[in-house]
Amino acid sequence: MDLTKEEILPYGHHVAKLDYRKILDRCADRPDGKYIDVTAITPTPLGEGKSTSVMGLVQGLGKRDKSVVGAIRQPSGGPTMNIKGSAAGGGRSQCIPLNEFSLGLTGDINSIMNAHNLGMVALTARMQHEANYTDAQLAQRNLKRLDIHPKKIQFSWIIDFCAQALRNITIGIGGKMDGPTIQSSFAIAVSSELMAILAIANDLADMRARIAKVVVAYDKQDRPITTADLEVDGAMTAWMVQAINPNLMQTLEGQPVLVHAGPFANIAIGQSSVIADRVGLKIAGYNVTESGFGADIGFEKFWNLKCRFSGNKPNCAVIVATIRALKCHGGAPIPVPGKPMPEEYAKENVGWVEEGCKNLLHHINTVKKAGINPVVCINAFYTDRPNEIKAVKRICEHAGARVAVSTHWEHGGDGALEFADAVIDACEEKNDFKFLYELDTPLEKRIELIAKEVYGADGVSYTPEARTKLTQLAKDPEMAELGTCMVKTHLSLSHDPKLKGVPKGWTLPIRDILTYKGAGFVVPVAGAISLMPGTGSDPAYRRVDVDLQTGRVKGVF
């Protein structure tokens, strides 16, 4: 890699952070490399190997003697210790070392937890002091009364695990010196607005300014109260100042991988950081990043949020598909994590695959609406049948998309050469990148565009609460500066995870609209989504342990 010693900040023997400012200052006059996003069709609950495909593509491009870097999200401890496991890839296409990658890395998520929870500490402490002191006593401490409404608190506590018992809690049940007695909650750390800010900030100054705008509550006159009002924004930034530098790891074949930020895509922005992409585009000829879940969720946010915030324009988008997922969308039984795969998936069924390709075609068309060249990667499994693969290739090519079969899980970079060649060719073609909406488009119209053009809905409905917030936001002069970050299930194009393929004749229900002014977007919430996932009955932590002779962790996957 083209890095100087001063730009590398070692963390042990296998991981480092990169001083993004020194790199970007030194490389300011260089042209950017090719920018590639890896997305997917609507996944099964098992996932379709998108992270594995990112690693495989990076390795394949390396085998073609291309200067390449990967840029992926840091995994949350919640899924790692739950059913899903880590997100390092698999087989011969992984980000290594796995244990460091999966168990905290350099502490970025911990820094975000401390910063976020410090905001809650400041809020609840202020509420206690305002309850116990007169205005004159507050003034003696250089404080003014914020008059926080106890039922209009926007912030929660966060923890990096899936802990359903913490979704609804009561705090402050002691005496008057034990804080206010209020209903509160915990969310998973990667859903924090601070994680979104880390993902989209262009530099430290941008991150500092965004943290100051985070709304933590409203007062009794319904005016927003920010971290700056609590005078905690500087300290929150201090907790995150090291986290702003991307983490450097590698594939199994030695290509560099930048790991930075980790917001989920169904409940947050679902992207690795803008800063990691800026660094990758300057130090390599190809920067391969990943957006969470399917193109309806992760790619849509990459397209209309991340690229808008960063100013970067992609050259190509990869859509990862598996025969397994196509069969699921075509009528096969839905696989359940932790249970044996239904036997139907091991048998040839071209009809199911062809029917499932309707979902794939929908995502191809979504990528085309962004003006980007699509490449379909068939992430090959040993149960795939030649006739099933032929059907997918025929349908994709007829739709005008490049398609490549990749066996990177089994063969590493050597199995991804066809995949890499397709991406190289796509990057050489001109594209006409354009956003789905401009920021001066009214929020209601934006939601309608996303629902109809990306999800395939007939229209949008609103609960009375959501309609009230929509009306209020229409009058907010800052609305024109905010993007739109939709929240919905990742298991269907619709809001209903049971509806597979390309659902028809449905309306997208918006039950609430949240505002994240620090991150710079509003969040329309479709369907029932929790910011705190639950831990299942057979979690991964049951199989994680430590070798007492070597001290090495075992059982992480």
Curated annotation (Swiss-Prot):
Binding site for ATP: 44-51
Pathway(s) of this molecule: One-carbon metabolism; tetrahydrofolate interconversion
Keywords associated with the record: ATP-binding, Ligase, Nucleotide-binding, One-carbon metabolism
Gene Ontology molecular function, alphabetical: ATP binding; formate-tetrahydrofolate ligase activity
Domain of life: Bacteria
Claim: Ligase is one of the keywords in the record: yes
GO biological process: tetrahydrofolate interconversion
Enzyme Commission (EC) number: 6.3.4.3
Xref: InterPro entries: Formate_THF_ligase, Formate_THF_ligase_CS, P-loop_NTPase
UniProt entry tagged with the keyword Nucleotide-binding: yes
Catalysis performed (reactions): (6S)-5,6,7,8-tetrahydrofolate + formate + ATP = (6R)-10-formyltetrahydrofolate + ADP + phosphate
NCBIfam families reported in the protein's UniProt record: PRK13507.1
Similarity comment: family membership: Belongs to the formate--tetrahydrofolate ligase family.
The protein's name: Formate--tetrahydrofolate ligase
Underlying gene: fhs
